[in-house]
A protein has these predicted regions:
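Hydrophobic alpha-helical segments
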Residues: 2-75, 209
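Ligand-binding loop in jelly-roll beta-barrel domains
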Residues: 166-194
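A short beta-strand-loop-beta hairpin characteristic of the jelly-roll/cupin
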Residues: 121, 131-158, 168
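Conserved short histidine dyad/triad with adjacent acidic residue
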Residues: 112-131
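Short strand-connecting beta-turns/loops that link adjacent beta-strands
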Residues: 107-109, 131, 151, 177-178, ...
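Conserved metal-binding segment of the jelly-roll/cupin
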Residues: 116-119, 156-177
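Conserved hydrophobic/aromatic beta-strand scaffold that supports enzyme active sites
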Residues: 3, 101-103, 111-115, 136, ...
C-alpha cells in the first residue's frame, strides 16, 4: 500500500527504495511487485510507473537489461523485473525465432510481457477494431525494433513506449544481437482482432543494426 501511494505521488526517491526493500524482505516476489506496479500504472500514469519499475529492478535484480546481448535466457531473465514466462507456442507460426509470454495483468485491461530471443520478430500484422482498439507497447528490457509499413524502423530500449492505432500494419521484435522484452497492452475497443500477414524477410531484417 505504501509503495503504491508513494508511486502515485511521484515520490520515487530513497524513501521509495527503502519501502521496496522492505517489501522484498517481507516476501513480495519479483513477479508480484511487477504486477502491483503495472496495476498502479493505469491510475498513476506510466511516467511515474516507469521510475518505479527502474528502482524495483535495482532492488529485485541488481542487473542492467541493456547490457545483456546474445547471452542465455536465464541470464537475461535476471536483468528484468517482469517474468519471461513460457514459450509462445500458440502464436509460434506468426514469429521467426523463439518468443515467450507472461501474463502480468489478466483482469480489466490485459497486459502481457513478451520476450524475444535475439533475431526474433513477429510477422507484419494489423490490429483491427470497429471502434477504438490498437495496442500499446512499453519496452522493459534489451533492445528491439518497431516498424510501420512504409516507414523506417524505430530502435527501442527500456522505457520507450509505442502507441499503435488500429488499422496500422507493423511488426516488432528483437535486435539481431540482443534479447528484447515489452509489455503488450491491448487498447479497449469494439470487435478487436488481429490480422497476421507476411513474415519480415531475412534480407529486410538484415538491414537493421
Amino acid at each position: 500500500v505504501t509503495v503504491v501511494a508513494l508511486m502515485s505521488q511521484g515520490l520515487t526517491d530513497s524513501s521509495f527504495k527503502y519501502h521496496l526493500e522492505s517489501a522484498k524482505k517481507n516476501g513480495v516476489t519479483r513477479t508480484e511487485i511487477a504486477e502491483i506496479l503495472t496495476h498502479a500504472a493505469f491510475y498513476a500514469g506510466w511516467p511515474k510507473a516507469w521510475a518505479a519499475f527502474r528502482m524495483a529492478k535495482e532492488v529485485w535484480t541488481g542487473g542492467n537489461a541493456d547490457s545483456v546481448a546474445a547471452g542465455s535466457l536465464e541470464a537475461y531473465a535476471q536483468t528484468i523485473i517482469f517474468p519471461v514466462g513460457k514459450p509462445n507456442d500458440a502464436y509460434a507460426k506468426y514469429f521467426i525465432g523463439q518468443s515467450y509470454t507472461a501474463p502480468v495483468v489478466t483482469d480489466g485491461v490485459p497486459v502481457v510481457n513478451v520476450t524475444f530471443e535475439p533475431g526474433c520478430r513477429n510477422n507484419w500484422h494489423v490490429h483491427k477494431a470497429t471502434k477504438g482498439g490498437g495496442q500499446t507497447l512499453v519496452c522493459v528490457g534489451g533492445r528491439g525494433y518497431y516498424q510501420e509499413w512504409g516507414k523506417e524502423p524505430v530502435e527501442l530500449h527500456s522505457g520507450d513506449a509505442i502507441n499503435i492505432p488500429a488499422g496500422v500494419k507493423h511488426w516488432h521484435g528483437a535486435a539481431p544481437d540482443s534479447w528484447f522484452s515489452h509489455l503488450a497492452i491491448e487498447v479497449p475497443g469494439e470487435n478487436n482482432s488481429t490480422e497476421w500477414l507476411e513474415p519480415v524477410g531475412d534480407e529486410e531484417y538484415a538491414k537493421l543494426k
